[in-house]
Amino acid sequence: LLCISCCVSITECCQLMSGCAVEIKS
């Protein structure tokens, strides 16, 4: 799965602000 984030850091967004991130199938 790839993570598309509306935050600056994709990793931080996925871990800390999941509500700001969207997981999609690759």
Curated annotation (Swiss-Prot):
Keywords: Disulfide bond, Ion channel impairing toxin, Neurotoxin, Secreted, Toxin. GO terms for molecular function: ion channel regulator activity; toxin activity. GO terms for cellular component: extracellular region. The keyword Membrane does not apply. It comes from the Eukaryota. Expressed by the venom duct. Contains 3 disulfide bonds. This is Turripeptide OL49. It comes from Iotyrris olangoensis (Sea snail).
